[in-house]
Amino acid sequence: MNKLIPIFLVLLIIGCSGLNKEYPTKNYYTFDVINDIKVNSNQGKNYIKIERVDVNHAYHHRDFNYRTGPDEFISDYYNQFYKPVGALVTSELYKWMSSAGIYKDVLPVNNLINAKYILDSKLVDIYGDFSNPDDPRAILNMQFFLVDDSSDVAELAYSNVYNQNIAISSKTPGALVEGWNEALKNILKQLESDLRTFENS
């Protein structure tokens, strides 16, 4: 019986050392985009509904994605969006359009009010481009479709692709998120300008 004690002690020590092993802390991030142009009230005559942003299948998970070579990508399990990225971008898009004052009101897609327009969108790309170690960049590309839903047959009224390639200070997750925020702000600002021009034409 005594011969089993040393083996048991060794196993116990190994088990305890495994329990004490430290793992990297997971970090969670979100977007924080503010429309700097203040509008007194919604000035338009039409309602618009905002569909949830569709996301390229490659970015359905919450992990950050890094491009490390011409055809090489890796995901970062320890740095993530705190919600699915489509939900986060949808929230920023809704807030931005609500503050733009282009339309009479901006509505969620499940609202029962009949809206003239529906805004569909797709997040095509979102990743950190670290393929050049000396020139890290934040990539964010989106596509938008403005659908006229005022008649029995919906028609595409406007569409455009917006691509952003932002130089960032380092390959850290914090710097990457700052770059994505800048990229998303640039896209929403240009989208607002284009939709305002279209609405006033």
What are these regions (language model features)?
Residues 72-80, 150-186:
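Short secondary-structure boundary motifs at beta->alpha junctions and helix caps
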Residues 94, 98-102, 128, 192, ...:
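Sec-exported extracytoplasmic/periplasmic mature domains
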Residues 79-101:
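Structured, soluble extracytoplasmic/luminal domains of envelope-associated proteins
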Residues 1-16:
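Sec-dependent bacterial lipoprotein signal peptides
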Residues 47-52, 65, 118-122, 139-145, ...:
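Soluble periplasmic/extracytoplasmic beta-strand elements of cell-envelope proteins
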Residues 17-41, 100-155, 169:
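Surface-exposed short loop/turn segments
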Residues 86, 90-94, 181-184, 188, ...:
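Extracytoplasmic/secreted envelope proteins and their assembly/folding machinery
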Residues 16-87, 197-201:
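A structural "domain/chain start" motif
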